């Protein structure tokens, strides 16, 4: 938790399972990042106010068996709407960028390798 309080940003790398992030990531956020009033958040009359405002930006890299366009348009776009716009904001993280490799179950090794190289070359600004 001390490292989170002094970091400038955070990177999440996770699959999308059943239209959401896995329970293990939710548990990490629940037990580590929100482990008590005043550590990473404050409970107010209007809800949770995030205290990790030092984290200027988050990057979320995901994979999904569904195509990205389908996930964003038909499936409800839950990574953006819930994980980024709600969960991360409740922790105090105001800016986040999401990159998804969709249709991964039909991707070749060459396509997966290309995606990893593309991720490595992305400029991550914190």
Describe the predicted segments one by one.
Residues 70-126:
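Glycine-rich phosphate/pyrophosphate-binding loop and the adjoining helix
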Residues 1-81:
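Helix-loop-strand module that forms the ligand-binding subsite of alpha/beta enzymes
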């Amino acid at each position: 938790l001390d490292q989170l309080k002094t970091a400038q940003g955070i990177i999440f790398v996770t699959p999308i399972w059943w239209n959401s992030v896995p329970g293990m990531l939710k548990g990490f956020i629940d037990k580590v990042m929100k482990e008590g009033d005043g550590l990473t958040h404050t409970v107010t009359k209007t809800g949770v106010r995030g205290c990790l405002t030092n984290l200027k930006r988050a990057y979320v890299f995901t994979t999904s068996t569904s195509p990205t366009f389908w996930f964003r348009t038909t499936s409800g776009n839950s990574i953006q709407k819930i994980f980024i716009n709600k969960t991360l904001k409740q922790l105090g993280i105001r800016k986040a960028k999401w990159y998804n490799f969709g249709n991964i179950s039909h991707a070749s090794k060459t396509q997966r390798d290309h995606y990893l190289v593309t991720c490595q070359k992305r400029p991550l600004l914190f």
